[in-house]
Amino acid sequence: MSNMQKKTDVILIGAGIMSATLGSLLKELAPEWEIKMFEKLEGAGEESSNEWNNAGTGHSALCELNYTSEKPDGSIDIKKALKINEQFQLSRQFWSYLVNSNLIRNPQKFIMPIPHMSLVQGEKNVTFLKKRFKALSNIPLFQGMEFSDDPEKLKEWMPLIMEGRTSNEPIAATKMESGTDVNFGALTRMLFEHLQNKNVELNYKHSVENIKRMKNGLWEVKVHDMNNGKIEYHTAKFVFIGAGGGSLPLLQKTGIPESKHIGGFPVSGLFMVCNNPKVIEKHHAKVYGKAKVGAPPMSVPHLDTRYIDNKKTLLFGPFAGFSPKFLKTGSNLDLLGSVKPNNVLTMLAAGVKEMALTKYLIQQVMLSNEKRIEELREFIPNAKGEDWDVVVAGQRVQVIKDTETGGKGTLQFGTEVVSAADGSIAALLGASPGASTAVNVMLEVLEKCFPQYMEKWEEKIKHMIPSYGISLVENPKLFQEIHTSTSKTLGLSKKEAVYS
């Protein structure tokens, strides 16, 4: 078997935004390293990164209310919002570096300026939004945020949402002009095209079957070439598993101690997409509501202007669903296959703890199209069923693990890196905020897995990402400079915005 092994420095598993970002960073920091990528599907960005499989929001906590929770004393906890905003600034800087270096072109193909708004109804929620606005609006990262509870002003901001609204219930919104819509599918394809130009070997229709540690410390990756049915063995010093929902089963195959006692719970998503151009033209924003009491964070409803295939469109959702598959193109045995002796108690504990989530998912699965339209009418009172079609979005595998605070079988709602103690292998697990924070997450992979190179790489990283290692909250002048320059490079300045 050893004579069939093909050696390389780095193996990337999965052709999504995470592998694309890590590959792009490594090619700038260590251009001499040999990199190979293996993807089961026919092209890049076909699963979770695909533009139809995620919300396409440049998550920076400008409008997502689940990133600012209310404390027991009634004050607003903004720590998570600041963290997510800072992380998105890192992504903007790296993308700008790639554009300025002519490594990728035409940023309008993957990022567009779009106002981000939060919308709430009811006195209690209006009070919450007002407090949130006060807590954030003085912070440089949220400069320019506007608040209004005046129905006339709200008609200017969101005419489609206010049209035909007869309720006397208090209503309020905040607005940030500096929001973005990101086509992560287009960006992923651009990055892999760039990596191909940098001699990264891209292998599509190649399914990774196994990953095991060899006696010499290298990792052996068993690959099924679906083009000809042959089995190949590739070895590398470092392996990154960026396979979306497929990451957990592959991580389990490595046998590393860090892969134990982790489970995954798949949640599928549906969106409603508008097919009426007249309705689409009446809305120009990403408007996020507030999750209903008892509903999980991934259930926050939003009405989004999106740019897909250079065309303006309008989506509403998400509606959650349940499928045992870990990937949209996965198997119905994925969930069952992920239950191992080392995580069965963790999974069972989560099952007992998360009865509310289970109930919510069952209710969502049972929703008829008419019921979905009723939920849509909370946003668009005049919505007509014939103007909207249902599209199935991607699968998200929420991480289940034992934590000190939550105890056994705690469901996680973030994105996290799991790596071997020696840094030779890393996997990305979890969901939101996901793709928006890809650069921050991949910098974390570099720090965890290549600590011996970080001193050497630091100067180059800071050249690409000027705020690396610096808090923008504490350096408002630097934030202003970075925000202005990235807006200009990415075509996000108001005067430069071009809409299709």
Swiss-Prot record:
Q: Which domain of life is it from?
A: Bacteria
Q: Which cofactor does it need?
A: FAD
Write out the catalysed reaction. Answer: (S)-malate + a quinone = a quinol + oxaloacetate
Q: Write out the GO MF terms.
A: 2-hydroxyglutarate dehydrogenase activity; L-malate dehydrogenase (quinone) activity
Pathway it works in = Carbohydrate metabolism; tricarboxylic acid cycle; oxaloacetate from (S)-malate (quinone route): step 1/1
EC number of this enzyme = 1.1.5.4
Give the enzyme's main class according to its UniProt record, as a single word: oxidoreductase
Cystine crosslinks: none
Record keywords, A-Z = FAD, Flavoprotein, Oxidoreductase, Tricarboxylic acid cycle
List GO BP terms, alphabetically: tricarboxylic acid cycle
Q: Name the protein family.
A: Belongs to the MQO family.
* PANTHER family listed in its UniProt record: L-2-HYDROXYGLUTARATE DEHYDROGENASE, MITOCHONDRIAL (PTHR43104:SF2)
- Name used for this protein in its record: Probable malate:quinone oxidoreductase
Protein's organism: Bacillus cytotoxicus (strain DSM 22905 / CIP 110041 / 391-98 / NVH 391-98)
Gene name of the encoded protein: mqo
